[in-house]
Amino acid sequence: MNDFTLNAEVRSDLGKGASRRLRRLASLVPAVVYGGDKAPESISMLAKEVAKLLENEAAYSHIIELNVGGTKQNVVIKALQRHPAKGHVMHADFVRVVAGQKLTAIVPVHFINEAAPVKKGGEISHVIAEIEVSCLPKDLPEFIEVDLADAEIGTIVHLSDIKAPKGVEFVALAHGNDLAVANVHAPRVAPEAAEGAAE
């Protein structure tokens, strides 16, 4: 049994107005499922079930068993649209998982050994919190690890600096976009402190 399951119903009332009504009157989240050899499907899910599922970070990068009106299919989260102020999910895109066929998914980033550059007097800024990957379903990682043990002050860690797990490709790199992942910089000095030092 899949640890990540979600129940949904097919929706026929489409459009932005319909989606707003779903969210406001029925506490439902509109979504779309596509991919594989089936046509795209417009669905809706209980907002509280979606929120509960996403409490577990691993749900973002695991195969989810989606039960649409009694028909089960395996999917991964492709994209989430969140409310800009409240943060709750307003719309979701799911991609069907087909064995032996590559998929793209969003995977969380885990930073390790952050204490090393901090001990050298540096401060760390995380530029991204997730990475889009392409791989076979069996190779889908739970997270991508970024090791900052050797990062020096003034260093910018790029996507190309990260070793991808076996069988996993970073989508941005495949499109020639070497994203910044984190940077280590010298502590910012408050204006008052800088003036005092100058005197």
UniProtKB/Swiss-Prot annotation:
Superkingdom of origin: Bacteria
One cellular component (GO) term of this entry: cytosolic large ribosomal subunit
Gene3D superfamilies the record matches: Ribosomal protein L25, beta domain (2.170.120.20), Ribosomal Protein L25, Chain P (2.40.240.10)
GO BP annotation list: translation
GO molecular function annotations of the record: 5S rRNA binding; structural constituent of ribosome
InterPro entries xrefs: Rbsml_bL25/Gln-tRNA_synth_N, Ribosomal_bL25/Gln-tRNA_synth, Ribosomal_bL25_b-dom, Ribosomal_bL25_C, Ribosomal_bL25_long, Ribosomal_L25_dom, Ribosomal_uL5_bac-type
Keyword match Metal-binding: no
Pfam families to which the protein is assigned, alphabetical: Ribosomal_L25p (PF01386), Ribosomal_TL5_C (PF14693)
Secreted found in the keyword field: no
Keywords noted in UniProt: Ribonucleoprotein, Ribosomal protein, RNA-binding, rRNA-binding
Family, similarity comment: Belongs to the bacterial ribosomal protein bL25 family. CTC subfamily.
Function per UniProt: This is one of the proteins that binds to the 5S RNA in the ribosome where it forms part of the central protuberance.
Classification via NCBIfam families: bL25_bact_ctc, PRK05618.1-2, PRK05618.1-5, PRK05943.1
Subunit-level organization: Part of the 50S ribosomal subunit; part of the 5S rRNA/L5/L18/L25 subcomplex. Contacts the 5S rRNA. Binds to the 5S rRNA independently of L5 and L18.
Protein name: Large ribosomal subunit protein bL25
Organism: Pseudomonas fluorescens (strain ATCC BAA-477 / NRRL B-23932 / Pf-5)
